[in-house]
Amino acid sequence: MIQIDALPAFSDNYIWLLQDTAKRRCAVVDPGDAGPVERWLAANPEWVLSDILVTHHHNDHVGGVERLRQLTGARVCGPANERIPGRDLALDEGDRVDVLGVTFQVLAVPGHTLGHIAFFSDQPATPILFSGDTLFAAGCGRMFEGTPEQMQPALARLAALPEQTAVYCAHEYTLSNLRFAKAVEPTNPHVQQRFEDVSRLRAENRISLPSTIGLERLTNPFLRTSETLVKQKADEWKGHSNTTHVAVFAALRSWKDTF
């Protein structure tokens, strides 16, 4: 049985902490800061950090990797096509990696960065996805390195995962993403309800994650490029008709960048 908790870092990052409660072994995903993990380990000295999973090379995801590796000897698993500090296992599309007895499938999801990967497993009772900065709750990452032609299919691929899949993304951006989703689909009742729910959570300083793939299909405009109203809003933003899913996505992303 794997338990997953969030260790907050910086202003809005989450370092995901996976725990095998029977064996008292743990793993972390995207430790941009070693501090929160060190403090958790100090408070739980009987636990061993066995693995560090990395989705991409940005410093707010890898800044704590080398220190944690030096302190614990944990295995560092990260994308093969990016510079990851202390990486022991280079991962690419189709690879599998066993962590705490759970086998994760590696999915290449370029766009935010060119070598970005996600980790998916359907072994637990509830499938789980660590999506890094590719898929956010009600949103997606900026394209710092990739293109719409890369990122839209990557997101569509994640959207095709089982609807009950729990989505663990790396930032608490949900409320701002939902404000944009409301602008794109002002009559979508699922967006409105989610906005109200998340507003209550954040008012109490509570985490809005994990999401689910099913909820993202209903409320995330970047996964809804085939919806008539979403396309109409994208067309209005660009001032012309967007004839492909990629074009609609690109219009939405450029709109969100200035929203």
From Swiss-Prot:
Q: Keywords, A to Z?
A: Hydrolase, Metal-binding, Zinc
Which Gene Ontology MF annotations are present? hydroxyacylglutathione hydrolase activity; metal ion binding
Annotated Zn(2+) 2 binding lies at 60-61, 133, 171
Give the Enzyme Commission number.
Answer: 3.1.2.6
Gene Ontology annotations of biological process type: methylglyoxal catabolic process to D-lactate via S-lactoyl-glutathione
Question: What protein family is recorded?
Answer: Belongs to the metallo-beta-lactamase superfamily. Glyoxalase II family.
Stored NCBIfam families: GSH_gloB
UniProt-recorded name of the protein: Hydroxyacylglutathione hydrolase
Q: Give the taxonomic lineage as stored in the record.
A: Bacteria, Pseudomonadati, Pseudomonadota, Gammaproteobacteria, Pseudomonadales
Gene name linked to the record: gloB
